[in-house]
């Protein structure tokens, strides 16, 4: 059975921004740590925060999906076509969650999609073209390889966050993300996690464009 929990910060009155995010992957990839990093930034800066965690069969490598809404929202679930950002730690899970991404409308760009995959051309060309025609940015990064090269395959999640942080349209600045990673990661993993974040950020800056 999938389990769903809500995260709220009802005391905050700040309304600086409205952001809707989806993080997807499979059990063991650290989807929930990524959620915690983003939530940490929102809570520390006083943004209203609401979200949902769908753990599914996460203990056995099943799908894991989290919804995060920062700003003035009532429902914790991101609707189809509502996500500003999708981070997928597993390429097949990305296909299952692409429908959440927001198309360009009313003069605003579409959502941003960051996917962990070893081959930058893995995505079906027709699907990628369809997304791009909707103004959705699709960015693929070998986060597994980066984390493995740096000696910590379990830090694939940190590598993908670092890569995404290089995009100027990403809702959190790299310095805020780095500070949040430093706060939420266990001490024994902290130094290497920060190195992986920094290295992936540099790689992202070579690749990503607004």
Residue ranges of model-derived segments:
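Active-site cofactor/cluster-binding pocket
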Residues: 2, 15-210
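Arg/Gly-rich low-complexity intrinsically disordered repeat tracts
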Residues: 5-14
């Amino acid at each position: 059975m999938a389990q769903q929990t809500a995260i709220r910060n009802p005391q905050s009155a700040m309304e600086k921004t409205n952001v809707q995010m989806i993080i997807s992957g499979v059990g063991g990839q650290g989807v929930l740590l990524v959620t915690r990093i983003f939530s940490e930034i929102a809570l520390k800066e006083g943004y209203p925060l609401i979200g949902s965690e769908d753990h599914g069969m996460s203990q056995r490598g099943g799908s894991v999906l989290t919804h995060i809404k920062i700003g003035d929202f009532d429902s914790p679930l991101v609707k189809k076509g509502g996500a500003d950002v999708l981070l997928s730690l597993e390429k097949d899970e990305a296909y299952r969650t692409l429908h959440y991404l927001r198309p360009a409308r009313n003069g605003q760009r579409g959502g941003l999609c960051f996917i962990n995959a070893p081959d930058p051309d893995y995505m079906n060309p027709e699907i990628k073209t369809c997304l791009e025609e909707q103004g959705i940015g699709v960015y693929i990064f070998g986060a597994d390889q980066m984390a493995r090269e740096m000696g910590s395959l379990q830090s694939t999640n940190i590598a993908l966050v670092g890569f995404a942080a290089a995009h100027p349209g990403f809702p959190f600045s790299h310095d805020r993300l780095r500070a949040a990673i430093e706060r939420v990661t266990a001490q024994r993993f902290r130094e290497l996690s920060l190195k992986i974040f920094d290295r992936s950020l540099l790689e992202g800056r070579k690749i990503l464009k607004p």
